[in-house]
UniProtKB/Swiss-Prot annotation:
Residue ranges of domain TRAM in the record: 393-464
NCBIfam families for the chain: miaB-methiolase (TIGR01574), MiaB/RimO family radical SAM methylthiotransferase (TIGR00089)
Required co-factors: [4Fe-4S] cluster
A Pfam family hit: Radical_SAM
Name of the molecule in the record: tRNA-2-methylthio-N(6)-dimethylallyladenosine synthase
CDD domains linked to this entry: Radical_SAM
InterPro entries named among the record's database cross-references: Elp3/MiaA/NifB-like_rSAM, Methylthiotransferase, Methylthiotransferase_CS, Methylthiotransferase_N, Methylthiotransferase_N_sf, MiaB_methiolase, rSAM, rSAM_horseshoe
A single Gene Ontology CC term: cytosol
Native source organism of the sequence: Rhodopirellula baltica (strain DSM 10527 / NCIMB 13988 / SH1)
Keywords of this entry: 4Fe-4S, Cytoplasm, Iron, Iron-sulfur, Metal-binding, S-adenosyl-L-methionine, Transferase, tRNA processing
Primary localization: cytoplasm
Tree of life domain: Bacteria
Binding annotation for [4Fe-4S] cluster 1: C15, C51, C85
Length: 479
């Protein structure tokens, strides 16, 4: 049994799925007597929840681990663990590169951490728990090795008490040639709608006003149960009825599964956010084919025009990879044109990074020079920033409803007792809004009038309601 006086520090990088995983790991560790601390120096257990989507993210993790070598030498009683996608991908490599690490835990084995800790602290040596690889057995067997322990939750680990992530799907079966996720997260599996709705009710009871549904291709969600099949639209309809929830968001979407039925459901359910993150990755059919994305630009535009028709108020964002294998200047300019046509709310733009274990690493040549990747990255960012600012400027003078998240990063550095600080929040379309207010407004839905904008932020003020005195019957106005 784990001692009841242990402390844990956790560092999380990567996607929202990792943030949720960290919340659940901490909830589990608290049940075993651990308390959370803010710095590595205070901790008996140091956990690093890692990302493998790009090489840079992995190298940053190895660099952070390297800084712990002396700490471990001075304090051998401390336990160091690496969890998440890099743990599943690199496995024994982590022990070779950082031999002072005690535990390596893949994202499908996080429930094993307490038992692994018991073994480490009782002198049984280094521990590793990872899921089966795609070729290590039948898909059903491999899928079972990628377990989650939803809905084990800890509200104190969330970015705010009134916003929560809810996993509805794990894994991915798309096998894009550049991506490690099908290997690190395993086969695509949808949780049962009953589990999801039950967990959402718990989150609402804990004070969550907004939930964000998570999946690698979240709009592909399907679950077949004894009462038939539930798709994403059907799930949203069930979640919409939960008392206390004000907003429902979901990320990330796959273009070919953005159906008319789903869009009509979003349109007809007021709580569901019309913010749609639908990665295009490239504007070139040739590049998309090498990426094995499963659609053409004509397919993407058919989907986009469907959004414009059914849900004209939607804000759509995208992802782009620049410098993918064989990308020419002409290919790249097609990505520029796609952004200019679609006028995305924002785009997450990345330089291609070779990932060991992917089809691209095995079969394609990383032939775009690093400096060309950087130049294309900067150019595409500039185009997107210009478009984002132009479209944000159209909102000046409008009033938007904002879920106030708390003090902005700027305000965090200001006097904690200041009566007025810069607050931040988001609209239902996921636009960031800042305004002067006070800390008590966190968790409220407020009307904010927009006075100014940047590419990424709306700047406003709390809308005041004018009170007009009509006088009282029988009373003459004072002179």
């Amino acid at each position: 049994m784990i001692s009841m006086t242990k402390t844990v520090y956790i560092k999380t990088v990567g996607c929202q799925m990792n943030v949720l995983d960290s919340e659940m790991v901490i909830a589990d560790l608290k049940r075993h007597g651990y308390t959370v601390v803010d710095t590595p120096g205070e901790a008996d257990l140091l956990l690093y929840n890692t990302c493998s989507i790009r090489e840079q993210a992995e190298e940053k993790t190895y660099s952070a681990l390297g800084k712990l070598k002396e700490t471990k030498a001075r304090h051998p009683e401390k336990t160091i663990g690496v969890m998440g996608c890099m743990a599943q991908k690199d496995q024994e490599t982590i022990f070779r590169r950082a031999p002072f690490v005690d535990m390596v835990v893949g994202p499908g084995q996080l429930h094993a951490i307490p038992d692994m800790l018991t073994k480490v602290t009782s002198g049984e040596g280094r521990q590793m728990a990872v899921s089966l690889g795609r070729k290590d057995g039948k898909q059903t067997v491999v899928a079972r090795s990628h377990e989650t322990f939803d809905p084990l939750r800890d509200p104190t680990m969330r970015p705010t008490p009134f916003q929560a992530y809810l996993r509805i799907q794990i894994g991915c079966d798309k096998f894009c040639t550049y991506c490690v996720v099908p290997n690190t997260r395993g086969p695509e599996q949808g949780r049962s709608p009953e589990e999801i709705v039950s967990e959402a009710r718990v989150l609402a009871e804990q004070g969550a006003l907004e939930i964000t549904l998570l999946g690698q291709t979240v709009n592909s969600y399907r679950h077949r149960g004894p009462d038939g099949e539930t798709d994403m639209a059907g799930l949203l309809e069930r979640l919409h009825d939960i008392d206390g929830l004000k907003r429902i968001k979901f990320v990330t979407n796959y273009p070919k599964d953005m159906t008319a039925r789903l869009l009509e459901t979003i349109r007809d359910l007021p709580k569901v956010s019309p913010y749609l993150h639908v990665p295009a990755q490239s504007g070139s059919d040739a590049v998309l084919k090498r990426m094995k994305r499963g659609y053409t630009i004509a397919d993407y535009m058919e989907m986009f025009e469907r959004i414009e028709t059914v849900l004209p108020e939607a804000s759509v964002s995208s992802d782009f990879i620049v410098g993918f294998c064989g990308e020419t200047d002409e290919d790249f300019q097609k990505s520029v044109k796609l952004i200019e046509r679609c006028r995305f709310k924002n785009s997450f733009i990345f330089q291609y990074s070779v990932r060991e274990g992917t089809k691209a690493a095995a079969n394609l040549i990383d032939d775009v020079p690093r400096e060309v990747k950087a130049a294309r990255n900067n150019e595409l960012l500039a185009v997107q920033d210009r478009i984002s600012k132009e479209d944000n400027q159209k909102l000046i003078g409008d009033t938007v409803e904002v879920l106030v998240e708390g003090p902005s990063k700027k305000a965090d550095k200001s006097d904690l007792d200041a009566p007025i600080v810069q607050m931040t929040g988001r609209t239902i379309c996921d636009r960031i809004v800042v305004f002067d207010g006070n800390r008590r407004q966190a968790g409220q839905l407020m009307d904010i009038q927009i006075d100014d904008v940047s590419s990424h932020t709306l700047i406003g003020r709390v809308k005041t309601v004018e009170v007009v005195s009509l006088g009282m019957p029988g009373l003459a106005p004072s002179s």
